[in-house]
Each structure stands twice: as C-alpha cells, then as structure tokens.
Swiss-Prot record:
Gene: CCDC93
Matches recorded under Pfam families: CCDC93_CC (PF09762), CCDC93_N (PF21673)
Compartmental location: Early endosome
Transmembrane segments: none
Similarity remark: Belongs to the CCDC93 family.
InterPro entries: CCDC93, CCDC93_CC, CCDC93_N
Protein function: May be involved in copper-dependent ATP7A trafficking between the trans-Golgi network and vesicles in the cell periphery.
Alphabetic keyword roster: Coiled coil, Endosome, Protein transport, Transport
Full protein name: Coiled-coil domain-containing protein 93
Annotated segments matching region Disordered: 1-20
UniProt key word Protein transport: yes
Coiled-coil intervals, chain numbering: 285-474, 546-614
Length: 617
C-alpha cells in the first residue's frame, strides 16, 4: 500500500465535530447528568468526550439489566471503524429498552450532543428507577431472610398474645352472633318476590329497614335494653317524620310482613341474658329513665291503635308529602331562575366589556382626529387646498372609471348580441361559407405557429435541463465540506489499516529473519556434530577445525555488531521522529487554540457590529 509523502508518520486526523456553544452546553449537561446518576468517570479530564459519553451510556444500559456486546477492557484512541462498531452495538440495544428517542450511530460518533442529550436523559432516568427497584427488592429480600432466622421482641410479644386475642375474638363473635327473634307462621301467605324475602329474613332477626333515623334509633335502644312482646313489636311505629308516601308505603309493607310472623318460644315474654346483664349493670337513675321511656312507648302504641287518631296521622303525612313536593318544585324553579340570572349576568358583563372597548376606540379616534386637526391647523393652507383638490379629482376619476367599466360591459353585451344575431341571419341565408373558410385558414395558420412555438419551447426546456444538470454536478460548499469530512474519515481508516498492515509486515520480516538465523544455527550445530569425531582423530584436522570455529565465531560477532549498530540507528531515528511528532502535536494544539480564539474574536466582532448597527439605526 502506497502512503503519500509527508503523511507516513502523521497521526490520523480526528473527525470534525460541531463545536458551537449549544453543543458545548449539551455536553456539559450530559456530563452533569451522568455524574449525578453515579458515573464518576465523566469527571476525568484526560478522557475524550466520546469516551465519557459512550462509557456513560454503556454504564446506564448495564445498570438497567440489559446486555451489550462490547469489550470489557478500556481501549484508548480507537479507530473510526471501532467507534462505529461500538456505537452500532449501543444503538441496537436502545429499541429493546423501548427508548422513545431515535439515535443513529454516526450521531454518537460525530458527537452530535443535541440529539444524544434526550437519549442520555432517558437512560439516566431509567437507570435511577431500576436502581430504586433493585434497592426495594434487595431490602425486602434482606428483611425476609432476617425474619427467617431472627425475631424482634415485638414479634415474641405478639406471638404470646396471639392465642389469647384469637380466643377473645371468637368469644365475642359467639356472644354477639345474630339471634332469631321471630319465625314465619306455617299458614302465612307465601312471599314471591326476592326483595320481600330478603326483608322478611332480616325481620326475623330483628333488623328493620325502611324507617326513619329516629325510628331506627328507637329500635336499636329496644334491642339493646328490652325485648317487647310480639304484639307490641308488630304494632310499634316511629314518630311522625317528614317523609313522602313511599316511606309510608314501605312501613306498611314491613307491617304486613310482620303480621305473618310469631315470636320465638324461648324469647317470648322475657328478656335476653345480655339485656338482663345490661340492666343489672346500670345505675338506678338509668333504670328509672328506661321505665319512663317504656311507659311513653306503651301510651303511644295504645294511642295509635285508635282509628280516629290513625286518620289524623295519615292526613298529616299526606299534607307533609304535598308540602314537600311543593318545596321541591319551588326549589327547581329557583335553580332555573338562578341559572338564567347567571347567564344574563355573563351577557351583561360581556356587553359592558364590548362597550368599554368601543368607548376606548372612540376616544382613540377622537384623539387621532384632534391630532389631525392640529396638524391641519399648523400646515400650509395652499398645500391643504391642493390636497383636497387632488382627493376630489381622485374620487371623480374613480367614479368615472366605474361608469366607464359599466358602459364597456353594456357595450360588450350589445356587440355580442349583434354577433349572435348576425350569425343567426347568416345561417338562415346560407351566406357564411366564405367567412368560414377564411376563419379556418387563419385557424390552421395560427395552429402551425403554436406548434412551432411549442417545439422551440421544448428545445429550450431541454437546454435548460442540460444546464441545470451541469450546475447540479458542481458540488456546493456544504457538499464539499461533507465530502472533505468523509475523505478525512476514509483517510483515517486507510491510515489505520496501513499502519496495521505495516506492523504485520514488520512482524513477518522479523520472524522470517529469526527463522533464517535459527536454520543457520541448526545447520552449524549439525555440521559441528557431524565433523567433530573426524576432526578430533588427528592433530592437524583438530587445529583446522578450531580455526574454522574461530572464524565462524568471529563472523557471528561481526554480524552481531552490525545488527547492534543498525538497531542503534533505528532507535536514534525513532527518537528523532518522536521529537518531530511531539513538535507537530504542539503546533496542532497551538493551531486549534488560535482557531478557537479567532472564532471567539469573530463572534465578539459580529456582536459589536450588530450593536453598532442597532445604535446607528
């Protein structure tokens, strides 16, 4: 492979990257995100931005429990091909993680931090969430493992109290379990609908539904303190409440269900054990209060059994129901009126707002009119007179233009009507053949002209297309810049391949030389071994053999001295080239620094020019 002169020992040029302020800001934000997430290698100043960003993305992916096929050991100064292969592996894992942002390998390799930032932000968020989930899982697993082998004092205390608590709860359930108070008679009417069956079953256990709150409280007091006989329970009613006819019908239905029931034999006419215990445990004042309440209830029940009292109560309930209906109607009417009031109030507010806008616009017009009058009073009267005259002339010309257009339109309609009449007359008289021939000839002539013009237009369009293609073949500045970047990348790849191939050739030549020397050594040893016994047979042959050995040793020493000398020369040349390389690197750094300072000065110059233009304008 042929390498251009002057570039054989030159380091591969790096790919140009966007180094504007926005890219630098995004790079700083990416590094701050990675450090905040726990990737502290991003603080190392010796690493390149590519190594920091790619390392951070790889760390986030592995933290999220996703596998990525990369080398375990860190490799510095990777080639373009190695970087692209690494970025392709990273990008291939992102769809598996269901990343909502798209990213291409060349964007990572080209350090396009604007497009890399959303992906890194999402990866850091996902890594933190995964770490929290793993922390919760490890914490719960640790607690479970601890609980398998150890116990806290609270756990021991709970285990000691557990059996006693279970026994207490069981006893409470046994004491307060539902007790059947009534039983349906055998000859009672059969209940058909399911809801009535449910109510009847609940009534058998003393559960009454459909009463008011006051009635429910009275029943609870009766259940807790005393159990009345079945006749009193069937006749018991709540105090009059403000309910409608449906509630009265519900009470009537419950009473009907109660008529088909009889009290249980074990509880008829006596108190339950729990009620007796409660009464005994109460004080004397409470016992007196219970007796008075029982007397009041008994008097109310006896009063309600009278038919004349029953009619008055029913009439009172109906009046209350009708009044409730009237209250509901008035309430609905009030709500409708309130809604209309709110609507009218909104319209009034909107009208006031419109009025305010109109008044402000009127004031603005008045101010402008006053300003115009002021200007008119200050202006020259002759100029104003000329302006008024010109405005009048303009208006007059506009009106004349409208009249002329209307007159032309009428004239055109009249002429078209005349043409139609003439055509009709000519068709009747048969005198239009000669004009038709002239018209056809003129039409054919114009048609041929049109065809020629179209041919010329097509030829001109072809010429324009050819010129356009030639213009398009010349690359623009952006395309040339892109080509230059791609050529630099290709050159870097070719240079790396050339360097690698050169190393292989050097290694091959070294091994080949080593092989030649080893073969010579083996042949020499074999020759010595074969001729040793024959040379030792006589003194003359022995001396000759020793002289030959000395000559061979001398030749080997000379070859060794030559190789050492060549090695020293190569080493000196390497040191010299290394010094030159370091000088070139220093020049390159100085060049990049100068370019950066020049860009900064250009930016400052542009800002000053823009400020100068703004101040001058």
């Amino acid at each position: 492979m042929v390498v251009p002169r002057g570039q054989e020992h030159r380091a591969p040029q790096e790919v140009e990257t966007r180094e504007d302020e926005e890219q630098n800001i995004k790079l700083t934000e990416i590094l701050e995100l990675l450090v905040a997430a726990g990737y502290f290698r991003a603080r190392i100043k010796g690493l390149s931005p590519f190594d920091k960003v790619v390392g951070g993305m790889t760390w986030c992916i592995t933290t999220c429990n996703f596998d990525i096929d990369i080398d375990l050991l860190f490799q510095e100064n990777s080639t373009i091909g190695q970087k692209i292969a690494l970025t392709e592996k990273i990008v291939s894992v992102l769809p598996k993680m269901k990343c909502p942002h798209r990213l291409e390998p060349h964007q990572i390799q080209g350090l396009d931090f604007i497009h890399i930032f959303p992906v890194v932000q999402w990866l850091v968020k996902r890594a933190i969430e995964t770490r929290e989930e793993m922390g919760d899982y490890i914490r719960s697993y640790s607690i479970s493992q601890f609980q398998k082998t150890h116990r806290l004092p609270e756990d021991d205390e709970f285990m000691q109290r557990k059996e006693k608590a279970i026994k207490t709860v069981t006893d409470i359930f046994e004491v307060y379990k539902p007790q059947r108070k009534y039983k349906r008679q055998k000859g009672a009417e059969e209940i058909l609908d399911e809801e009535s069956k449910v109510h009847a079953t609940l009534l058998e256990y003393g559960r009454r539904y459909g009463f008011s709150r006051q009635a429910g409280k009275t029943e609870q007091t009766e259940d807790k303190k005393i159990v009345l006989p079945s006749g009193l329970a069937a006749a018991g009613k709540a105090e009059p409440c403000d309910e409608d006819d449906l509630r009265a019908a519900e009470e009537l239905r419950i009473k009907t269900l109660m008529t088909g029931m009889a009290a249980m034999a074990t509880e008829e006419g006596k108190l339950t054990a729990s009620t007796v215990g409660q009464i005994v445990g109460l004080q004397s004042d409470e016992i007196k209060q219970i007796v008075s309440e029982y007397a009041e209830k008994q008097s109310e029940l006896s009063a309600e059994e009278r038919p004349e009292r029953l009619g008055a109560a029913q009439q009172h309930r109906r009046k209350v129901a009708s009044l409730n209906k009237q209250i509901l109607q008035k309430t609905k009417l009030l709500e409708e009126l309130q809604a209309k009031f709110v609507d009218l109030q909104a319209k009034c507010t909107e009208a006031k707002k419109t009025l305010t806008e109109v008044e402000s616009y009127s004031e603005k017009l008045d101010k402008e009119l006053a300003a115009l009058e002021t200007i008119e009073s200050q202006a020259d009267s002759s100029v104003l007179q000329n302006l008024r005259m010109l405005v009048a002339i303009n208006e007059n010309l506009k009106s004349q233009e409208q009249e002329f257009k209307a007159h032309c339109r009428e004239e055109m309609e009249r002429l078209q009507q005349d043409i139609e009449n003439l055509k009709a007359e000519a068709a009747e008289n048969g005198e239009e053949e000669e004009p038709n021939k002239l018209i056809d000839q003129q039409y054919q002539t114009e048609k041929e002209k049109l065809q020629k013009i179209r041919l010329l237009l097509a030829r001109r369009n072809r010429e324009i297309a050819i010129l356009q293609r030639k213009i398009d073949e010349v690359p623009s500045r952006a395309e040339l810049t892109q080509y230059q970047k791609r050529f630099i990348e290709l050159y870097s790849q070719v240079s790396a391949t050339h360097k690698e191939t050169k190393q292989f050739f050097t290694l091959y030549n070294t091994l080949d030389d080593k092989k030649v020397y080893l073969e010579k050594e083996v042949n020499l040893l074999n020759s010595i071994h074969d001729n040793f016994h024959q040379a030792m047979a006589s003194s003359g042959s022995r001396e000759q053999f020793l002289r030959q050995m000395e000559q061979i040793v001398e030749g080997i020493k000379q070859n060794r001295m030559k190789m050492e000398k060549k090695k020293q020369e190569n080493k000196m040349r390497r040191d010299q080239l290394n010094d030159e390389y370091l000088e070139l690197l220093e020049k390159q750094r100085l060049y990049f620094k100068t370019v950066k300072e020049f860009k900064e000065e250009c930016r400052k110059n542009e800002m000053l020019l823009s400020k100068l233009k703004a101040s001058s304008s």
